[in-house]
């Protein structure tokens, strides 16, 4: 995703720029970081990487505009500035700094989206898996892709989306990030989570049983991390499709379950 490249650039930039700022007042430090974020698309241009991932024409313009919109949003930039200050105060570990700058916004904000947008978001996430090789897809869903490789794989998959889909996907991402600044993740109660998990697993079971490779898929779901990449990818797609097919009063709860960090 383009934003992670920008944030990596930001992290490297503030290694030099933040310490002097922190010697001043906290508010001055925060204001300077927000200003730096606004200039980040110029300091750490990502156009070449986007082109290498397959973005071109309207889709390239959309990706660049999305990154700029996020970095120049005072609400989001203020949140990231606070995280950077926490990093230098020792309240945020450097090991998780670049991921931790913005990931919490997604994790929280997505859970506050209206059902229609939440459905759209997860449908696009499902389609992105089709834009990857079975190996990359399997490693991704098993959480075994190196960060740099994961960024590239997801970027290339996003570049395969239509411009119309990409535009709406970015709009929803931006909205989720703004929601995530001020709201904690919406969570199901333990009882609701247990009930909806049963509903989801039953839906997944029915889909798996109807597949030609039902036994392999069943074994994969029981021991996901050690499964073959291609089968893990297929199982992840089935799981996502089963959740997206749930309707009625359970729909939102199933989507919240799917959105849990």
Predicted regions and their residues:
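Secretory pathway export signals and precursors
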Residues: 12, 132-133, 229
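Bacterial N-terminal signal peptides
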Residues: 9-17
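N-terminal Sec/ER secretory leader and immediately downstream segment
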Residues: 24-142
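Long, contiguous all-alpha helical interaction modules
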Residues: 50, 79, 143-157, 245-247, ...
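Sec/Tat signal peptide C-region and signal peptidase I cleavage site
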Residues: 19-23
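A cross-kingdom marker for long, charged
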Residues: 201-261
């Amino acid at each position: 995703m383009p934003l992670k490249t920008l944030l990596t650039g930001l992290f490297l930039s503030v290694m030099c720029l933040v310490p002097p700022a922190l010697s001043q007042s906290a508010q001055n430090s925060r204001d300077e970081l927000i200003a730096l974020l606004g200039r980040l698309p110029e300091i750490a241009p990502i156009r070449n990487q986007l082109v290498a991932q397959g973005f071109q024409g309207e889709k390239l313009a959309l990706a660049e505009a999305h990154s700029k919109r996020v970095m120049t949003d005072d609400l989001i930039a203020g949140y990231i500035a606070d995280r950077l200050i926490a990093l230098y105060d020792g309240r945020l570990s450097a090991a998780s700094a670049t991921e931790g700058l913005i990931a919490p916004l997604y994790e929280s904000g997505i859970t506050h989206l209206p059902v229609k947008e939440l459905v759209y978001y997860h449908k696009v996430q499902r389609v992105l898996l089709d834009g990857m090789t079975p190996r990359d897809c399997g490693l991704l869903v098993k959480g075994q892709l190196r960060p740099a490789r994961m960024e590239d794989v997801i970027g290339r998959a996003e570049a395969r989306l239509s411009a119309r889909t990409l535009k709406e996907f970015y709009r929803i991402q931006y909205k989720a990030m703004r929601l995530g600044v001020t709201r904690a993740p919406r969570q199901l109660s333990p009882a609701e989570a247990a009930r909806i998990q049963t509903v989801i697993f039953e839906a997944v079971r029915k889909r798996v049983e109807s597949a030609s490779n039902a036994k392999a898929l069943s074994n994969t779901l029981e021991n996901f991390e050690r499964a073959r990449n291609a089968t893990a990818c297929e199982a992840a797609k089935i799981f996502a499709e089963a959740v997206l097919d749930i309707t009625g009063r359970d729909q939102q709860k199933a989507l919240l379950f799917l959105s849990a960090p």
